[in-house]
Each structure stands twice: as C-alpha cells, then as structure tokens.
Amino acid sequence: MIGPLVKLALTTALVSILFSNPTAAQVLPPAKKAARVAITKGPVLELVSDYLTFFRWITTNPGGSDVHFGIVHYGTDPKDLSQTAKSEVRVNRGHPETMFRVSVEGLKPRTTYYYKVTSTESGGKSDGVESPISQFTTPKS
C-alpha cells in the first residue's frame, strides 16, 4: 500500500510534467511569411506636440514571427533619417492586418521633421514595406 505522502508526491510530479512540457497542440508553428506586405492605411500622425508625436499605420499581416517592430526613421533633413524610434507589436495570425503605433519623443519646438515608416520581424529582418518620406512641423512650446 502506497502512503498518502508518496501518492501526493507522485501526483505533483505527474502534474508538473504534464503542464511544463507543452504538446504540439499548445505551441503553434510560426505563421507563414506573407509573400508581399503593404501599407494599407497611413502613416497618420495621431498627435503632434512641441516634443512628442505618435505615428500609426496599418499593413497587411506580415506573418512570420509573432513579434514585429514598427519603426519610424526621422530627422530634420530628408536625406538623413538616421534617428529612429520603434515599438513592438504582436501579430494576430487570424487577422488580415496589423496596426503599428510608435511614439517619437525629444522633438524640438517649431522644427520641421521628415520621416518614413518601416517594419521588421523580431530578428530584424525587414517586412519589405516602407512609406514615402513625409514631413511635419512641431508647434511652438
């Protein structure tokens, strides 16, 4: 006859094994990478203040890794967009589009900035999408 402490130990070990080792049904394979990713809406400036701006844009679902990054490349010279800001987004495999939202901070008042947006997979590989260069001017403080 097995004592109650041994039964408890065996039950605990079994539960631990069952829940710590995910089965194939629990871990989804990476989504198929889209053949072509395109910006379908935006980029739109949601807010422009003297020091902060929010950018939002929507692309077709890029697939691939579950985590992607929206990146804003910006600067005061349209030929030098070397400053960047990025934000992580989780891709919803069941949705045809993905929304990116990135904040850019530390801007100067009454300054014209040029920008473009791109996106990448979590490993840094480009989604192959890039907006045209646009501009905005921050208001005075």
Predicted regions and their residues:
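Bacterial N-terminal signal peptides that target proteins for export
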Residues: 1-10
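Bacterial N-terminal signal peptides
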Residues: 9-20
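Sec/Tat signal peptide C-region and signal peptidase I cleavage site
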Residues: 21-25
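Short, surface-exposed linear motifs at loops/turns and structural transition points
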Residues: 26-141
